[in-house]
């Protein structure tokens, strides 16, 4: 909390990682998507970027820190659109831009999205990670028109599951990105109770 009583907001877009840390995080994201967190060792990450396991450990003391950092850099891609939508008090154009970016990120990182939604280690870590919880609350408060009560939280969980499930489901693997994007945008608008 700040001295004024408002919640300190963790801005993912402002996180600073060194070049070495970014190499670890990028390699880890790909390996997590392929093998899951438990199936990815620090040695595998080290081998992927051509360094020793000790070099990876020097950048991040635990695999959990790598998981959190990797998720934060991905969510950082949404921070600018989220801030714009918050500044616009949830105006339709800003919300549409934010929703488009959420969908674009999900489509562009399909394998990772599946891992984020189903890997038990990631689910546990993010469930306990306050900055992630704050980010998701900010995101869905904007998308749901300023509400984040119990009903809104259930809607948010359903929408997140719907987007993540839709981009990774075997029924849509043959769809091109443009078709999937258009269908997903329209259906998500309905789930949000919005129409543009």
Model-predicted regions and their roles:
Residues 93, 113-114, 125-196:
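Hydrophobic/aromatic-rich alpha-helical bundle segments in the mid-to-C-terminal region
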Residues 78, 106, 163-167:
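Hydrophobic recognition helices of helix-based DNA-binding modules
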Residues 100-107, 118-121, 142-145:
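Helix-loop "lid/cap" segments that line or gate small-molecule binding pockets
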Residues 23, 27, 31-65, 69:
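Helix-turn-helix
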Residues 65, 69, 80-114:
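Hydrophobic alpha-helical connector segments
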Residues 85-89, 116, 120, 170, ...:
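Secondary-structure edge/capping motif, primarily at the C-terminal ends of alpha-helices
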Residues 1-19, 30, 147, 173, ...:
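N-terminal intrinsically disordered/low-complexity leader segments
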């Amino acid at each position: 909390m700040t001295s004024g009583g408002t919640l300190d907001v963790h801005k993912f877009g402002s996180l600073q990682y060194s070049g070495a840390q970014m190499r670890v995080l990028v390699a880890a994201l790909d390996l997590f998507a392929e093998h899951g967190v438990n199936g990815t060792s620090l040695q595998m990450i080290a081998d992927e970027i051509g360094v020793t396991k000790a070099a990876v450990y020097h950048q991040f003391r635990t695999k959990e820190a790598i998981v959190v950092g990797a998720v934060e850099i991905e969510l950082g891609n949404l921070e600018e659109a989220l801030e714009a939508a918050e500044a616009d008090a949830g105006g339709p154009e800003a919300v549409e831009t934010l929703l488009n970016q959420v969908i674009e990120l999900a489509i562009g990182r399909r394998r990772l999205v599946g891992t984020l939604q189903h890997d038990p280690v990631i689910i546990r870590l993010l469930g306990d990670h306050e900055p992630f919880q704050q980010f998701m609350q900010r995101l869905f408060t904007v998308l749901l028109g300023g509400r984040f009560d119990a009903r809104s939280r259930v809607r948010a969980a359903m929408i997140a599951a719907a987007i993540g499930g839709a981009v990774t489901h075997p029924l849509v693997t043959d769809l091109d990105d443009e078709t999937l994007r258009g269908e997903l945008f329209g259906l998500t608008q309905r789930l949000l109770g919005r129409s543009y």
